[in-house]
Amino acid sequence: MRVFPIPLLSHVRGLIRQGPSSRFYVVPALARTNLTISHSEQVKEGTFDYKALELNDIGVLRVLNSMKDDPYLALSFLKRIEGNVTLPSVQAYATVIRIVCGWGLDKKLDTFLFELVRRGDEGRGFSVMDLLKAIGEMEQSLVLLIRVSTALVKAYANLDMFDEAIDIFFRAYYSLGRAPDIKALNFLISRMIASGRSDMVVGFFWEIERLGLDADAHTYVLVVQALWRNDDKEELEKLLSRLLISETRNPCVFYLNFIEGLCLNQMTDIAYFLLQPLRDANILVDKSDLGIAYRKVVRGLCYEMRIEDAESVVLDMEKHGIDPDVYVYSAIIEGHRKNMNIPKAVDVFNKMLKKRKRINCVIVSSILQCYCQMGNFSEAYDLFKEFRETNISLDRVCYNVAFDALGKLGKVEEAIELFREMTGKGIAPDVINYTTLIGGCCLQGKCSDAFDLMIEMDGTGKTPDIVIYNVLAGGLATNGLAQEAFETLKMMENRGVKPTYVTHNMVIEGLIDAGELDKAEAFYESLEHKSRENDASMVKGFCAAGCLDHAFERFIRLEFPLPKSVYFTLFTSLCAEKDYISKAQDLLDRMWKLGVEPEKSMYGKLIGAWCRVNNVRKAREFFEILVTKKIVPDLFTYTIMINTYCRLNEPKQAYALFEDMKRRDVKPDVVTYSVLLNSDPELDMKREMEAFDVIPDVVYYTIMINRYCHLNDLKKVYALFKDMKRREIVPDVVTYTVLLKNKPERNLSREMKAFDVKPDVFYYTVLIDWQCKIGDLGEAKRIFDQMIESGVDPDAAPYTALIACCCKMGYLKEAKMIFDRMIESGVKPDVVPYTALIAGCCRNGFVLKAVKLVKEMLEKGIKPTKASLSAVHYAKLKAKGLR
C-alpha cells in the first residue's frame, strides 16, 4: 500500500494568527502607595494601595480626574473600588462616563451603562435620573449628553425595560432639544418587536411623528413590520398614505431604502404595493431608479421563494417600458434553481438568450448548477465550454461547478487541467475550489492526487478550513484508508482545527461504506466525547451499507431521540426488505415511546410494505392502531389499503374503507377512484368524482376504456377518447395497448405518432401475440425485429409468443433457436416459454428433448407445470406404443 504524504503536510506551519491583546490593567489591592509618582501612574504600575487612601468621594474623584487621558484605566480603577464596602458615588460614575464619552468609545459606554442599569437603584445606590443630573452638572456639551441618552435608551431596550427607554428618549428631547441618535430609536423599536410588544411600537411612533422628530427609512420599515405583525391593516394603510404625501429631503433615496428594507424583512408585498403609486405619481421619475426599485421587489419575492409572483412583477416592468436587467434575471433563475424547478430556470435562461440579454457569471454559475442538480454533468461541462468561448468573464464559482461536474464524471485529471487553466488566467483559487477538487479525487479513489492538492494549497498560503479537512478525512475513510484518515484528524488538531462531530461522522460513514465495519466501531468507541450525532451516523452508515441488522441493533440500544431523518432512513430501509417489516413497526413503536411523532408518510409506507407481501391482516392491525391513537390515515395510506383489498379480490372490504375515508374527511383523489374502478368496472363514480371536484387523468380514462372494450361498447370507447381530447389529456402507451388488446385488428400507429406516443414492450407483445394467433409468423417476426430496432428491449413475453407460434406450426427447430436467442440476450426464461417448448416437442414426437428440457428446468429451480409433466408422460407412453 502506498504511503501517502501526510508527514509532508504536518510540517507545514498553520496560519493561526495571534490576535492583538486588548489593553487591561490589574490593580492589586495589597500594594503600597508610592508617594513620589501620581495616582494614575501608581495604578498602572500596580503599586497603588487602596487601603492607604481614604476612599471618600473627593479622593476617588481626584484619582479619576487624573486618569482623564486614559479611559481604560479609569474604567479599571472604578471596577476595582466597586469591590469595597462603600459604593462609589454618583459623581464617580458620572466622571467615568464623561471620560469614556470624551474619547468617543461608544461601545464601551454601551456596555458600562448596560451593567449599571441592570443593577437597579439599590445595587447602584442612586437612580438613573441622579446620574443624568450629575453628568449635566459636570458637562455642558450637547453631543456628550446626547451620547449618554442614546446609550441609556439602548441599555434599557436590551433589558426589555421599554417604558424606561421611552421615558429617557423623550426626557432627552424635552431637556436637550434633541432626541437620541436615530440608531437608538431603531434599536429600541426592533427590540420591542422582537419581544412581542408591537402594540407599543405604534403609539411610540405616532408620538414621534407628532413631535416632528426625524425618522429614517429603517424606522418606517420597523413600524410597518409591527403593524404587519399586529395585522392592523387600517393603521398600515394610514401610515403608507401619510408617507406618500409627506415631503422628505431626498425622496428618491428615502423610498429606495424603504423598499429595500421592506423586501429584506420579507414584506415584499407591501414594497410592491408602495412602488406602484410612487411610479404613477412620478415620485420615482428616472427609469433607472424605477428599475432599481423593481429589481429590489423581484429579488425580495425570490428570497421569499415566490418565483411566480416575481415573474409577474417582471411582466409589469416590461409593460411600463422598464427593461429587466441581468440582476433581475439572475434572481429569477437562482430562485427557480433553489426551488428545484430546474426546467423552468433553464427555460428563463433560454428566453434570455433569444432576447440577446447580457449574461453575467452569476447566471452562468446558476445554470451550470441546474444541470448538475439534474444529474446532467456532461451537459453542464459542455455548456461551461461554450460559455468559456464567449466574452463572458467567468469567475472561480463557474469554474468550481465545472470541477464538480468533471469529478462526478470521473474525469479528475481533466478537472485539474481546467484548474491550471483558471489559475493561468489570473483567477486566484480559494479554499472551496481546492475542496471540490480534493472531493473529486477522493470520489474516484485518487487519494494521492488529493494529498498533492492539499500540499499545493498550503504552499499558496491559504489556510485549510474544517470543511476541506472533513472532505479529505471522509474521502480517505471511504477508500478504506483508515490509518490515513486517522492521521488527518491528528494533523487537524496539530494545526489548530478541532474536529467536530461532522468530521467524525464522515469518517464513520466512510469506513462503513468501505466495508470496514470493525474499524468504524473501533473509531466510534475511541471517541472521547461521543455525541448523539455520532450514534445517528452509525445507524445511517449501516443503513447505507445494507447492514440492517447492525443498524437496527444499534438503534434499539439508544435511549434518546434521534433526528427524524435518521428514523426515516432506517425505517425506509426496513420497509424495503420483506423480512424486516416487523422491525419497521417496532421502530415506530420506539418513536412513540420516546415522544417523537413519526412523519405521516411513514404510516403509509409501513401499511404499503405489509400490503406488498400480501399480509393484509398486519396492515389492517396497524391501521386500527392508528385509529385508536386518533391518527387519521392520509390519502396514500387509504388508497394503498383499498388497492390491496381489490388485488386480493375482497371488494367489500375495499369499499368499506373507501366509505370510511370519506367519513373522516379524507378526500379521495383520481388514483383512489381508478383503483376501485379497476377492481369493479360496474361502479358508477362519475357524479361523485364531479362532486369532489376530482378531475380524471389518463389512468382513469384507460381503465374506463378497458371496461367498455370488454363490454364491446365501441361507441362509449370513442366517446371517452373524445372527452380526453376535450380535456387535453394525451393518451399514453398503456391506453393504446388496452385498446389494441381488445381490438387488435385496429391500426393505431398513425394516431400514436401524431401524439408522439412511442410503443413499449407491452404494446409490441400484444401486436406479436395477435399475429401469432392469426398464424402470421412472418409478420410477428417482422414486428419483433422492429421492436429491437426501435431500441425497446424485449422481455420473456414476446419471445414466448414466438416460441409458442413456432411450436404450434411445427417449426420446432426455429422455436429452439428463438429460445436460445432469448437466453443469449440476457433474458432468463421462466416457466411459460419452457412449457410452450415442451408442448411443441411432445406434439412433434421429440420426447427425449422434452425430458431434457424438464431436467433443465429443475436444475434451474423452475418448477414444471402439471400440464408439462402430463404432456411428457403421455408422449412417453405414445412412443412406447402403449396408448
Swiss-Prot record:
Taxonomy, superkingdom: Eukaryota
Single biological process term from Gene Ontology: embryo development ending in seed dormancy
Family annotation (Pfam families): PPR, PPR_1, PPR_2, PPR_3
PPR repeats: 145-180, 181-215, 216-251, 253-285, 290-324, 325-359, 360-394, 395-429, 430-464, 465-499, 500-534, 537-561, 563-598, 599-633, 634-668, 697-731, 760-794, 795-829, 830-864
InterPro entries: Pentatricopeptide_rpt (IPR002885), TPR-like_helical_dom_sf (IPR011990)
SUPFAM superfamilies: TPR-like (SSF48452)
Keywords associated with the record: Repeat
PANTHER family for the chain: PENTATRICOPEPTIDE REPEAT-CONTAINING PROTEIN 4, MITOCHONDRIAL-RELATED, RESPIRATORY COMPLEX I CHAPERONE (CIA84), PUTATIVE (AFU_ORTHOLOGUE AFUA_2G06020)-RELATED
Protein name: Putative pentatricopeptide repeat-containing protein At1g13800
Species, as recorded: Arabidopsis thaliana
